[in-house]
Amino acid sequence: MHGNHRNDTLVLHTGNEIDGQFGALSIPVYQVSTFLQDSQGNTKGYEYSRSGNPTRTALEQAFAALEHGRRASAFGSGLAAIAAVFMLWSSGDHFVVSNVVYGGTYRLLTKVLNRMGMTATFVDTSDLAAIEAAITERTRAVFVETPTNPLMAVADLEAIAGTCRRRGLKLVVDNTFLSPYWQNPLLLGADLVVHSATKYLGGHSDVVAGLVVSATDELGEEVHFMQKAMGGILGPQDSWLLMRGIKTLSVRMEKHEQNARELARWLTTLPEVRKVHYPGLEDHPQYAIAKRQARGFGGMISFELADGATADRLLDRLQVITLAISLGGVESLICCPAKTTHASMPAEVLAGLGITDRLVRLSVGIEHVDDLKQDILQGLRGHA
């Protein structure tokens, strides 16, 4: 496939070359641990599945094309992918990181990587001045979620990339919430893009995976080395499932966003809802940035209710929307981040950010939007 094809075509055909032996339309699952060597050191391109597997390679090549990158590496989870990226640096190195960030990323930085002498400063990455003020002589990279999980703040990636270039830093972007269908950070100046592929890329809540895509071959080789050295690989069966999910990424993302935009506007009209966080609302503080740097606003919403008890009642009463962590599946999922996805962050940090027990996060699925509205209403009011 050529890079000038539109996203709808790329997600369907990239990396899915027809099998030359039997004409199979789907890449085979190479469920194998090791490969025949014709003679000592003479292989057909693969020797051991930790260092490379044809099914995983097909996924990695396809995803590098979707993100307009040079090389991709697939990992056993999103956190494994993020950990491999941070391991590109060393003891004494410092990172500037979004203060509203996935709880697992926060835990990795503050409970694991800190033991290795790495440090992080958490700032509002929608504020360029805050990023610049946090940079020190030991800073090596800026790590940005945009939109952030769960408050949906949007960072100006081109502006941050400019700062990183001037200061000799790498820019790493977690693009999980928008996927490459809506946003391509590498085209905006990022050096590395990470994904929890468990979410929109898989799309069916049946695979756990992570991906890293690099802007250069050199960075891609460094990430691949970490993949091989640390062993956090994605297996062939999960690689195949992920490739299957990506084939329908375009139609799913369109429906996710269509539903989310309508739900977000509707939620703002409910007296029970104090505030709605969605970058597709025109009163969102970074609406103009989101509109400029992405092709869509995505399917994630968070909203605030009167208090934690009201939020609990809503979550307990829902019948169509599922109470579960994770996001990006075809079914709508809802949770209270303060009690689940971000519970590893200190209570005082969460409170300062506004991630409280009255905030709920909604991953909008592809159900009929009127059924989702009806479910939320009966959850809030106890009747349909």
What are these regions (language model features)?
Residues 1-53, 59-62:
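N-terminal "arm"/small-domain region of PLP-dependent enzymes with the aminotransferase-like
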Residues 2, 13, 71-271, 277:
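Conserved PLP-enzyme active-site core in the AAT-like
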Residues 4, 8-25, 309-349:
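C-terminal core of ALDH-fold dehydrogenases
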Residues 34-83, 87-88, 104-111:
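Conserved N-terminal alpha-helix of the aminotransferase class I/II PLP-enzyme fold
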Residues 119, 133, 137-140, 252, ...:
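PLP-dependent enzyme catalytic core of the Aspartate aminotransferase-like
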Residues 230-231, 318-328, 379-384:
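A common structural junction motif
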Residues 242-251, 298-306, 361-365:
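Short, well-ordered beta-strand elements within core beta-sheets of diverse protein domains
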